[in-house]
UniProtKB/Swiss-Prot annotation:
It comes from Klebsiella pneumoniae subsp. pneumoniae (strain ATCC 700721 / MGH 78578). The gene is speE. Homodimer or homotetramer. This is Polyamine aminopropyltransferase. S-methyl-5'-thioadenosine binds at Q33, E108, D140, G141, P165. HAMAP family: Spermidine_synth. The keyword Transferase applies. GO terms for biological process: spermidine biosynthetic process. The active site is at D158 (proton acceptor). The lineage of its organism: Bacteria, Pseudomonadati, Pseudomonadota, Gammaproteobacteria, Enterobacterales.
Length: 286
């Protein structure tokens, strides 16, 4: 390792994580982002945008399974799914495993992200870009949800952190647009950072989403390269019952979907909605 250069993440001040770089596969500044993909002995291929790790081959399955199977199995009858972001294709891969879904629309602001991920992160999409149910739209997510005539049963916001291009996906304009194109009984989910270190993000999202949805909460998972504690995912719907389904119902839907997962299971689904007290306290503070 001493002979290999080190890549340091710049997300937090005063502490962080580093990766040894075995081989740089791609590094280029696009119109929107500074993007790098490199090999690391511990985590396989690593993709980072603007100095922040976005995904690694070794642990991406945790994030993508939880972002997809939790809302899709909670809904129980989703036919039309919208993914905002997700250019690496792994979110699409997991959504496409649900054969009952009829259409999958993905909106990505940067066509370059999609093209190089197909080349350099092929295990992430695993051929899902060729699914006949899939449509790719190159557009700004806020613009799309406020202009589209399509409606969706589940919306998944695979957004980056709320800096740079990702900032708009944490705004009231985006959340209002998502509510606008979400079918009755639909579910919206979004990554919302590691709540111990990024608590303000969770509080801000909760406050804004509550203007548009009757039931707003979070669920969580522990993802190694998103260090600092549990990662939270925002959850918003007008049907509170969908967040409190019994493990028996989730188990039956999981069995019917014929899924085999590496992290997600019905027990994890139910337990994921249990949140630490410090987050409850922050969300309820005046």
């Amino acid at each position: 390792m001493a002979d290999n250069p080190l890549w340091h993440e710049t997300l937090h001040d005063h502490f962080g994580q580093y990766f040894s770089v075995d081989n740089v596969l791609y590094h280029e500044k696009t119109d929107h982002q500074d993007l790098i993909i490199f090999d690391n002995r511990a985590f396989g291929r690593v993709m980072a945008l603007d100095g922040v790790v976005q995904t690694t081959e070794r642990d991406e399955f945790i994030y993508h399974e939880m972002m997809t199977h939790v809302p899709l199995l909670a809904h129980g009858n989703a036919k039309h799914v919208l993914i905002i972001g997700g250019g690496d294709g792994a979110m699409l891969r997991e959504v496409s495993r649900h054969r009952s879904i009829e259409t999958i629309t993905m909106v990505e602001i940067d066509a370059g992200v999609v093209s190089f991920c197909r080349q350099y992160l092929p295990n992430h999409n695993a051929g899902a870009y060729d699914d006949p149910r899939f449509t790719l739209v190159i557009d700004d997510g806020v613009n799309f949800v406020n202009q589209t005539t399509q409606t969706f049963d589940v919306i998944i916001s695979d957004c980056t952190d709320p800096i740079g291009p990702g900032e708009s996906l944490f705004t009231s304009a985006f959340y209002e647009g998502c509510k606008r194109c979400l079918n009755p009984g639909g579910i919206f989910v979004a990554q919302n950072g590691v709540c111990f270190l990024q608590q303000d993000e969770a509080v801000g999202s909760h406050r804004k989403l509550s203007h548009y949805f009757r039931d707003v909460s979070f669920y969580q998972a522990a993802i190694p390269t998103y260090y600092g504690g549990i990662m939270t995912f925002a959850w918003a719907s007008d049907n509170e019952a969908l967040r409190h389904l019994s493990s028996e119902i989730i188990q039956a839907r999981f069995h019917k979907a014929n899924l085999t997962c590496r992290y997600y299971n019905p027990a994890i689904h139910t337990a994921a909605f249990a949140l630490p007290q410090y987050l409850h306290d922050a969300l309820s503070a005046p």
